[in-house]
Amino acid sequence: HPFKCERSSVIIIADVISLYPDSMYTEGMSVIVAKRPRLPVACLDPRIKSLNYLNNILAKIEAIDAGILEAIMLNTEGLVAECTGDNIFIIKDGVISTPDTEAGMLHGITRQYVIDTVAPALGYTIEERSHQVEDVKGADEVFLTGTAAHLTPAAQQEATTAEAFRQNGFVKLGSYFTPPEVE
């Protein structure tokens, strides 16, 4: 019972995390669109980091079963929310956009860093707005962000190569991030 807890505890683990193989940070990674939707905000607000990642884990399993390491999760309205462990950004015609927080995603620290610091420093216009899957498929570039994911280029599973989504914008943005150290 939560009210019987006399003293709260905090556990901190400090370690280097590398979510993906080193090559994916430079060459990009394929992503699929998960069949499982993101939980509605009214049921479990994903902006609260409560460690309840069951929905994300099930979508991640779906991706891994397809031979892919990451999946884009849609909300129950069919709009892009986030990936299983990362925020998603789209570059189209020189504008960087990302789903707004109403889409039902965790408001990531690295996401905010791109919005507040990186994009403006490089002269990009940034928009927080709704995205359809077609927006992702029609993007000039797609990248994922996260504290552990850093900045990772992405491509549709159907795309021929991740290079199709890695243009000059990604290289410029990537210069603001240090990739995970290779041991």
Question: What function would you assign to each model-found segment?
Answer:
Residues E158-E183:
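N-terminal auxiliary "cap/dimerization" subdomain that precedes the catalytic jelly-roll/cupin core
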